[in-house]
Amino acid sequence: EDVLGNQAPFDFDVSVKDLYSAFKTGATLVLIPRRMFSVVTELLDYLCEHRVTTLIWAVSALCLVAQFRGFTYKVPESVNKVLFSGEQMPAKFLSQWQHYLPKASFVNLYGPTEITCNCTYHVLSRERSYSGGLPIGKPFPNERVFLLDSENREITAPDVPGEICVAGSALALGYYRNPEQNQAHFVQNPLNDRYPETIYRTGDLGKYAESGELFFCGRKDFQIKHMGHRIELE
């Protein structure tokens, strides 16, 4: 039986994945006390004691364990699935997790809050070096992800940056009482002139590799991510 270890507080969108994944599958969900993410030894004790199998964590939480060399204290060997999102995963910390959990699956997730947390995923292969970075993967069911240039033309060629746009059933209705942001981000699909179809313009930039895989490559504005939180530098 799967046991999910909840990392995100309930006012953070990542918690939705823990809650509804557990409800949908009948898995057990354990609520890890917040203070334990400041005391890595206690956190690892908790994961081992509750035999947690699945982690759907922000990258910053995984980095915390690796930075403080937590696995030299204890390895939660019951963990067999690690899914992460929020920002780009540093290769040196990812390799540490993979080294100490050799049988676990690792999944890179991508997506903003506005499309219900995630819209793409990539299951990592242990036989691949990922020297060019981690792809953000392919869309989840009922989602479409594509790139638009500055003139609203779709980009399909490799190595050409464009804005990542999302369509599908998981889009939010919009921002609460913020019509200016709604007009900028929740817009009619410029590729569809046949019927109304709202897309979300993420403000993130992506590009395709020669393999056809999609990679995140920055922002079109001055927003950054730090420890999973959006920060506007303007």
Residue ranges and their predicted role:
Residues 35, 68-69, 96, 178, ...:
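Residue-level signal for well-ordered alpha-helical positions
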Residues 59-60:
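Short secondary-structure boundary segments
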Residues 1-5, 13-53, 126:
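Conserved AMP-binding/adenylation subdomain of ANL enzymes
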Residues 19, 23-27, 52-56, 66-135, ...:
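Gly/Ser/Thr-rich phosphate-binding loop
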Residues 8-12, 35, 113, 168:
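Conserved AMP-binding
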